Amino acid sequence: MLTGKMKLIDRVSAINWNWLQDDKDAEVWDRLTGNFWLPEKVPVSNDLPSWGTLTASEKQLTMRVFTGLTLLDTIQGTVGAVSLIPDALTPHEEAVYTNIAFMESVHAKSYSSIFSTLCSTAEIDEAFRWSEENNNLQRKAKIVMEYYRGDEPLKRKVASTLLESFLFYSGFYLPMYWSSRAKLTNTADMIRLIIRDEAVHGYYIGYKFQRGLVLVDDARRAELKEYTYELLFELYDNEVEYTQDLYDRVGLTEDVKKFLRYNANKALMNLGYEALFPRDETDVNPAILSALSPNADENHDFFSGSGSSYVIGKAVVTEDEDWDF
C-alpha cells in the first residue's frame, strides 16, 4: 500500500505517430532508434594490452574521467531527460525524451562495462569514492540539478542542452586522445557511440528550447538569453577547475580547455545563440578532431548503427545437411 502522495496523470491519449504536430519528433526518434546500441557488443577486452602500457597515473586519470561521465549520464538518465517530459508540447516529444532517458542509462552502464573489463574491484571502488568527494564534479551536478528540479521549463532545457553539448566534453577528450595514439581504440569506439547519441540529444533539446522561445514575449526572450550566458560562464569556470584537477598532471589542461570552449560554442548554437569564444581560443588539436571524425581509424559511422568494433551476430537459415560433417 502506498503511504506517500503520488501525483498521477488521470488521462492519457494513445499516441498516434501517423499524425504529427512536429515532423522533427519523428525524424529524431528514427535517428535515435536507428543508432541503438549496447555496450556488451563492443569488445573492450581487446584494449587490455594497451591498457597495460599506461602508467598508474594515466590509468587513474582515465578511471576518474569515466566516473565523472558516469555521474553526468546518471543525472541525465534519471532526472534530466525525465524532467523535460511534463513540459513537452507533443506526445511524440514525450516519447523522444523517454528514449533519451533510456540511452543515458545505457551510457552510464557502458562505463561500468569498461571498468569491469580493464580494472580491479579496488580500483573501481576508489574511482567512485573520488567522484563523491571531488568538489568540482559535485558542484556541476548540483548546478544542473537545481534547474531540473525547478519550475521553469525553458531554463531546464538550457541546462540540459549545456550538459549534453558542453559538460560531457572534458571527459570525452581523453579517450579521443588515447585513440589518436592507437591506445584503447575499442573503448574509444564505444565513446564515439555515446558522443553520437549526445550530439542528437543536445540538438533536439536545443531545438525544442527554440520552439519554446517563440511562445514568449521579447522581454522573456532577453531574460532567457542573459540567463543562458550566465549559466554557461558559471559552468565553464567550474569546468576549468575540474579540468585542471584532472589533466594538470599529464600536461593536457590547455588542450582540454580549447576543446571545452569549442563545444561551449556548439551548445550555444544548439540553443540558437551566437558563439561566445573566438576562433583562436577554440583551435582544438587536429588529432582530437580527427579521432572524433567518422573517418577515424576505427571507421566509426556516425550515421549508421555503430562503429567497426561493434559486433552483431548475423542469422543464417540452415538446412539439416549443413550439419553433416
From Swiss-Prot:
It catalyses: a 2'-deoxyribonucleoside 5'-diphosphate + [thioredoxin]-disulfide + H2O = a ribonucleoside 5'-diphosphate + [thioredoxin]-dithiol. Keywords: Deoxyribonucleotide synthesis, Iron, Metal-binding, Oxidoreductase. Fe cation 1 binds at residues 73, 104, 107. One of its GO terms (molecular function) is ribonucleoside-diphosphate reductase activity, thioredoxin disulfide as acceptor. It is an enzyme of class 1 (oxidoreductase). NCBIfam families: PRK09614.1-1, PRK09614.1-2, PRK13965.1, PRK13966.1, RNR_1b_NrdF. Tetramer of two alpha and two beta subunits. This is Ribonucleoside-diphosphate reductase subunit beta. It comes from Mycobacterium leprae (strain TN).
